[in-house]
Amino acid sequence: MTRPKTFFDISIGGKPQGRIVFELYNDIVPKTAENFLKLCEGNAGMAKTKPDVPLSYKGSIFHRVIKDFMCQFGDFTNFNGTGGESIYDEKFEDENFTVKHDKPFLLSMANAGPNTNGSQAFITCVPTPHLDGKHVVFGEVIQGKRIVRLIENQQCDQENNKPLRDVKIDDCGVLPDDYQVPENAEATPTDEYGDNYEDVLKQDEKVDLKNFDTVLKAIETVKNIGTEQFKKQNYSVALEKYVKCDKFLKEYFPEDLEKEQIEKINQLKVSIPLNIAICALKLKDYKQVLVASSEVLYAEAADEKAKAKALYRRGLAYYHVNDTDMALNDLEMATTFQPNDAAILKAIHNTKLKRKQQNEKAKKSLSKMFS
């Protein structure tokens, strides 16, 4: 018996990411596999609870994602985990629990208790043996595992685990029986700026976390792309690349580095947040400026010049959010490291002027209240 193959074409935040291909265990759980296949095919009719909504995954989202656990989808009626329907009726029974949750990238039915299967399902990110005997495994991912990891690593709402950017199933369908997974299917695609690294270091086949040189190459390659885009005034892309480098640094903490290697990493922990801060300033993302600049001030390798830059950029952020007291505090502190810096001195002058205007405005408001 040939196992059928279906696909999801995924976008994140409106940006296409590629295709996930599933192989369905129709030889083990034929009814459950058929349900999923028909929902991918999209021609099984309309939902009973919402007659204007087709029984199809197309256009629905991954509404619940928990890192190191699973990515859940399939609520095409309510988009929040409370809806969805099977092709048989709203719910159908647990077919069997033959296949165990013993590895990542398995496809398993979500439910609200025994015999409540509908259209919602999830992809495992790790082995989840505590789900054995409770959820029906009916397939696995055979292509697009890097996309599953990308979904897994999305920032999510802390209350409901919904990705902050929509992870959408733009299209879905059934593939020919003779479909073969391309040899380079899991290779990281190179984006239009030349970046071919995954968002997570440990998930990139080009990177060996035990090999310092491969880690450093990843960080410096992406950093250089960010700098190139900054020079072209493409600040949003530059910021994206610098933030990616920052994530690389924060997930890399080996214990056996040589002194010279430690110094290189520590220098990057200064230069990259400084770059994030200046990009964020250009984009008026002042909250990010405050966070990145503060990281520099706590960095072990930050010298006087770096501290002056961090205080200056943080001071400007405070200025733009109208906290002139904090702005002056930072800017004047910056002069202790760079006393003759014209940009810092100009910022101090502007901040004092702004504070004076704020005080005058406050006095006028008070006088009106008591007049």
Curated annotation (Swiss-Prot):
This is Peptidyl-prolyl cis-trans isomerase CPR6. Interacts with RPD3. SMART domains: TPR. It catalyses: [protein]-peptidylproline (omega=180) = [protein]-peptidylproline (omega=0). It is an enzyme of class 5 (isomerase). Present with 18600 molecules/cell in log phase SD medium. Its EC number is 5.2.1.8. PROSITE patterns: CSA_PPIASE_1, CSA_PPIASE_2, TPR, TPR_REGION. It comes from the Eukaryota. Residues 7-174 form the PPIase cyclophilin-type domain. PPIases accelerate the folding of proteins. It catalyzes the cis-trans isomerization of proline imidic peptide bonds in oligopeptides. SUPFAM superfamilies: Cyclophilin-like, TPR-like. TPR repeats lie at residues 219-252, 270-303, 308-341. It is found in: Cytoplasm. GO terms for molecular function: cyclosporin A binding; peptidyl-prolyl cis-trans isomerase activity; ribosome binding; unfolded protein binding. Its main location: cytoplasm. GO terms for biological process: protein folding; protein refolding. Belongs to the cyclophilin-type PPIase family. PPIase D subfamily. It comes from Saccharomyces cerevisiae (strain ATCC 204508 / S288c) (Baker's yeast). GO terms for cellular component: cytoplasm; intracellular membrane-bounded organelle. Keywords: Cytoplasm, Isomerase, Repeat, Rotamase, TPR repeat. The lineage of its organism: Eukaryota, Fungi, Dikarya, Ascomycota, Saccharomycotina.
